[in-house]
């Protein structure tokens, strides 16, 4: 298995779902990416118990804890003969997104909280992209 990078994140289990929500937010705010459950940070494939409820829970947890809401693709895949979960997050035209009320961006293999100046810039870009003549002073 590859190593983690700017578009690839590994989680050994769904017990790390809160961290995965932050990764999903960071990916959406940058170039997109994929989160794999059942793989250690070093790339060792452990596998993951997978049910329809597990897949729905991951999708719903990401959706309910991001703003604007993210709707990732969540699927069971097999890697090295073991069941894992792949969460695919596309780069979002609605960025910046927040996770648990805070904006994040992917930098290398880590998720970094965006500072206020960068967050303001993202917001202005979003509104300007939709043709609004609106500055942050009006929000």
PLM region spans:
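Conserved N-terminal catalytic/coupling substructures associated with nucleotide/phosphate chemistry
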Residues: 1-137
């Amino acid at each position: 298995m590859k190593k983690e990078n700017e578009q690839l994140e590994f989680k050994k289990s769904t017990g790390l779902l809160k961290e995965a929500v932050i990764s999903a937010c960071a990916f959406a705010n940058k170039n997109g990416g994929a989160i794999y459950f059942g793989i250690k940070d070093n790339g060792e494939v452990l596998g993951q118990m997978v049910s329809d409820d597990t897949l729905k829970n991951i999708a719903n947890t990401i959706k309910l804890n991001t703003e604007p809401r993210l709707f990732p693709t969540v699927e069971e895949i097999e890697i090295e003969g073991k069941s894992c979960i792949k969460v695919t997050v596309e780069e979002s035209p609605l960025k910046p997104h927040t996770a648990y009320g805070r904006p994040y961006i992917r930098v290398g293999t880590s998720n970094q909280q965006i500072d206020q100046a960068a967050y303001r810039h993202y917001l202005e870009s979003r509104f300007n992209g939709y043709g609004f003549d609106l500055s942050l002073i009006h929000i």
